[in-house]
Amino acid sequence: MPLLLTGKQFHNDLKTNKCLAIFAPLEGGYETRLLRRMRAKGFKTFITSARGLGDPEVFLLKLHGVRPPHLGHQSVGRNGALGEVQQVIPQASELFNENDKNKLLWLLEGQVLSQSELESLIEICTNDNKLSIVVEMGGSRKLEWKPLSNYILDEFES
């Protein structure tokens, strides 16, 4: 049986565009195959969900504060009216520990991201030349991908 998905074309497109929008069949399996192929080509990979991402640059790359959920009546004396702010390390910090490797950030459920959030992901890729980002933008009958900038033009400008 021939190898159906070698990942060569995907790797070439990822190298040239740095940021891809991908449409995979809903039954799954393609993501892990492509991730395995990219790891074999020397990428360090990190997969996470795009839900609840907020500001992508701050959430993925910088130390930021998160307020815990409000749990009803609490005393105002200790923490003020807004509550205490807990510092959270960047979600993709383990991806940026090694500077010598190419890095691949794979975001699931990318269809929930707004146009400005997608544009900030492209900006993150242009600032870090070793980082590539793949955003899953929904399902399709067959595996397809295109540059994220082309997806933004097609989806939001029309």
Swiss-Prot record:
Enzyme class: translocase
Keywords: Membrane, NAD, NADP, Plastoquinone, Quinone, Thylakoid, Translocase, Transport
Catalytic activity: a plastoquinone + NADH + (n+1) H(+)(in) = a plastoquinol + NAD(+) + n H(+)(out); a plastoquinone + NADPH + (n+1) H(+)(in) = a plastoquinol + NADP(+) + n H(+)(out)
Membrane topology category: Peripheral membrane protein
Pfam families for the chain: NdhN
Keyword presence, Transport: yes
Subcellular localization, as worded in the UniProt entry: Cellular thylakoid membrane
Any one Gene Ontology cellular component term annotated for this protein: plasma membrane-derived thylakoid membrane
InterPro entries: NAD(P)H-quinone_OxRdtase_su_N
Gene Ontology molecular function terms on file: oxidoreductase activity, acting on NAD(P)H, quinone or similar compound as acceptor; quinone binding
Domain of life, per lineage: Bacteria
Family: Belongs to the complex I NdhN subunit family.
Assembly behavior: NDH-1 can be composed of about 15 different subunits; different subcomplexes with different compositions have been identified which probably have different functions.
Job of this protein: NDH-1 shuttles electrons from an unknown electron donor, via FMN and iron-sulfur (Fe-S) centers, to quinones in the respiratory and/or the photosynthetic chain. The immediate electron acceptor for the enzyme in this species is believed to be plastoquinone. Couples the redox reaction to proton translocation, and thus conserves the redox energy in a proton gradient. Cyanobacterial NDH-1 also plays a role in inorganic carbon-concentration.
Record protein name field: NAD(P)H-quinone oxidoreductase subunit N
